A protein has these predicted regions:
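A short alpha/beta connector and helix-capping loop motif
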Residues: 190-200
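Catalytic core of non-heme Fe(II) oxygenases with the double-stranded beta-helix
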Residues: 105-175, 202-214
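Active-site region of the double-stranded beta-helix
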Residues: 70-100, 108-122, 129-135
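Short conserved micro-motifs at the rims of enzyme active sites and ligand-binding pockets
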Residues: 36-37, 187, 207-210
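Short beta-strand His + acidic residue motifs that chelate non-heme Fe in jelly-roll/DSBH
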Residues: 113-116, 182-189
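Residue-level detector of short, conserved catalytic/binding motifs and their immediate flanks
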Residues: 102, 123, 194
Length: 217
């Protein structure tokens, strides 16, 4: 294929139907003693629930209302703030947003989470409260025809991959469309992997007023 390069082409490389995913390292800047105490408070709250758990495998908090707990107030405000910035970045026009669910996940050695989506929500996210980068989150291209023809790759890039993984780096947040299929790889660490997950729904008019399939949330 090298002979192709002798021609001078003018190309406009347009990436259509984007799947927008956001990775935020150092999501909670632990600079001051106060910020560190916030993180420690969230860890203690989850650890206390973990000690009194009713089951042992792939543990999650029983209720998904951590955003209503005082220990998660600062974290919740951070999630709302960055979610509003994302929606503004994507040029959506909404009245407001709301967290519908927030819960904690604890994965022990050899545990994993199977493929799933987060139905009836617009954005979803996960934050790694405690992790040594084992048990990455993995996203899969949901388009059924995307793997019909897959040429061999010179290099693996965002442009030619149908599966992408992101390490569960401590203090990292990953925010993605709720419809995007994802799973969590097996935890091969001897330490527990603690994450906080949440869902975001938009408020306001969905669709255009002249469309029959519009709605007002």
């Amino acid at each position: 294929m090298e002979e192709v390069y002798k021609w001078r082409y003018i190309m406009d490389h347009q990436k259509i139907f984007a799947t927008n995913l956001f990775v935020l390292d150092d999501f909670l800047p632990q600079i001051t003693t106060a910020e560190k105490s916030i993180v420690d408070g969230m860890k203690k709250y989850i650890s206390d629930l973990w000690v009194n758990r009713k089951y042992d495998e792939n543990w999650q908090t029983k209720s998904a209302d951590l955003h209503k707990k005082k220990e998660f107030k600062y974290f919740t405000e951070s999630v709302i703030g960055v979610s509003k910035k994302i929606i503004n970045t994507l040029d959506y026009n909404v009245k407001d947003i709301a967290i519908t669910d927030m819960w904690a996940n604890v994965l022990k050695d050899q545990e994993h989470h199977p493929t799933h989506t987060h139905s009836n929500n617009f954005l979803s996210g996960t934050y790694y409260l405690q992790s040594d980068q084992s048990a990455s989150i993995v996203f899969h291209d949901p388009r059924p025809a995307a793997d019909v023809i897959v040429p061999r790759r010179k290099n693996t890039t965002l442009n030619n991959s149908s599966v992408l993984s992101y390490a569960s780096k401590q203090n990292r947040a990953v925010i993605f469309p709720s419809w995007l299929p994802h799973w969590v790889q097996q935890n091969k660490s001897k330490h527990k992997r603690i994450s906080i997950a949440w869902n975001i729904q938009v408020k306001g008019q969905l669709g255009e007023h002249h469309e029959f399939q519009s709605a007002d949330f």
